[in-house]
């Protein structure tokens, strides 16, 4: 979206954490990139670099929250807006060890309340409602999140019912639930295949491999790792459905991406995923449990008309989203907030 703002004539500076080998400053597609600090020090570096130095250089600062915000209401000398895709909430318990998990879970509502009078931008009604539950008083704009255009050569569905997961192999994504649901499906349905695309923490990947082995389904489960975009889209187009079981998402952009390939999604009824799927139109939303997911898989395989209807609905729903539109909506909201 920032590239589109630059093309519209805006000047954009993006401050981010550094990484090994990264230049401290660069220009990418017209965007000035400034890097300092690392994961746990980037917030302090932002204060050191920009405190008292924003006015006259910028019209607005966007405080983008990825679990931890930059606390701009406490130090920015120009109006700030909050960009937040999702609250962490339950993710703390899956991705952090005690006591960090408990501390993070307890503190998150309190530090987000510092922004209650700050204009916020998010990508789903679920996150908007989460913010409102914290007593948010300022406007919250939901930005329809788009994707780059997906170009997929026409391919047929795999002869064997194939299900797909795309994303991080991480505890909060509950990929272990997908494996258990697939085992349930295999035990009482036609033979199928499960492809897991993505990587993640080695300990969790090993846990998944042990689970697959203990269930005796190694022959039907493929750990694909990260794939080139074209290959990922080809596999999406061949799959009967995308499976998503996260504890929560901001939206679940891969759902829209799969939909652009004509592939519906079977998802848990959790924040974000219940927004990105239209139940019975672009996919199916089920109660969060492997058994409910397996039932949805069996239902889809046994009902070709449902397959066709959901595939068409997923493609049509995905076509209502574009990055051009996302950039326009967010830019218009930003301009309106400074007038």
Report each predicted region and the residues it spans.
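Short hydrophobic beta-strand element within catalytic cores of glycosyltransferases
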Residues: 255, 264-267
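A conserved mid-protein helix/loop that constitutes part of the nucleotide-sugar donor-binding site
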Residues: 161, 168-184, 189, 206-207
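Aromatic "clamp/platform" in nucleotide-sugar-dependent glycosyltransferases that forms part
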Residues: 247
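Membrane-proximal helix-turn-helix segments that form the acceptor-binding/catalytic region
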Residues: 100-120
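Nucleotide-activated donor-binding/catalytic signature segment of Leloir-type glycosyltransferases, i.e.
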Residues: 206-227
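Conserved acidic donor-binding segment of nucleotide-sugar-dependent glycosyltransferases
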Residues: 279-280, 284-290, 299-305
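Glycosyltransferase donor-sugar binding loop
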Residues: 18, 193-207, 225
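Carbohydrate-associated surface elements
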Residues: 126, 146
């Amino acid at each position: 979206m920032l590239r589109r703002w630059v093309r519209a004539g805006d000047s954009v500076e993006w401050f981010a954490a550094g990484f090994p080998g990264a230049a401290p400053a660069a220009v990418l597609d017209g965007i000035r990139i400034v890097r300092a600090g690392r994961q746990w020090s980037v917030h302090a570096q932002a204060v050191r670099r920009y405190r008292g130095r924003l006015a006259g250089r910028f019209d607005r600062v966007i405080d983008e929250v990825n679990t931890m915000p930059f606390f701009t209401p406490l130090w920015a000398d120009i109006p700030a807006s909050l960009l937040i895709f999702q609250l962490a909430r339950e993710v703390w318990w899956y991705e952090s060890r005690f006591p960090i998990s408990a501390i993070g879970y307890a503190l998150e509502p309190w530090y987000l309340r510092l922004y209650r009078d700050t204009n916020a931008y998010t990508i789903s009604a679920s996150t908007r409602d989460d913010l409102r539950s914290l007593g948010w008083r300022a406007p919250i704009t939901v930005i329809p999140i788009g994707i780059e255009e997906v170009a997929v050569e026409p391919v047929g569905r795999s002869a064997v019912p194939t299900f797909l997961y795309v994303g991080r192999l991480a505890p909060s994504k509950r990929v272990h639930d997908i494996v258990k649901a697939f085992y349930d499906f295999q035990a009482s349905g036609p033979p199928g295949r499960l492809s897991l695309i993505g990587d993640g923490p080695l300990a969790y990947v090993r846990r998944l491999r042990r689970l697959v082995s203990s269930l005796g389904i190694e022959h039907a489960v493929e750990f694909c790792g990260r794939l080139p975009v074209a290959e990922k889209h080809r596999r999406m187009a061949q799959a009967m459905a995308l499976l998503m079981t996260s504890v929560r998402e901001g939206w679940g952009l891969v759902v829209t991406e799969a939909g652009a390939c004509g592939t519906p999604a079977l998802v848990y009824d959790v924040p974000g995923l219940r927004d990105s799927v239209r139940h019975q139109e672009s996919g199916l939303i089920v109660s969060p449990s492997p058994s409910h997911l397996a039932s949805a898989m069996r239902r889809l395989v046994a009902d070709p008309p449902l397959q066709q209807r959901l595939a068409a609905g997923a493609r049509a729903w995905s076509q209502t989203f574009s990055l051009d539109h996302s950039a326009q909506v967010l830019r218009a909201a930003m301009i309106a907030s400074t007038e």
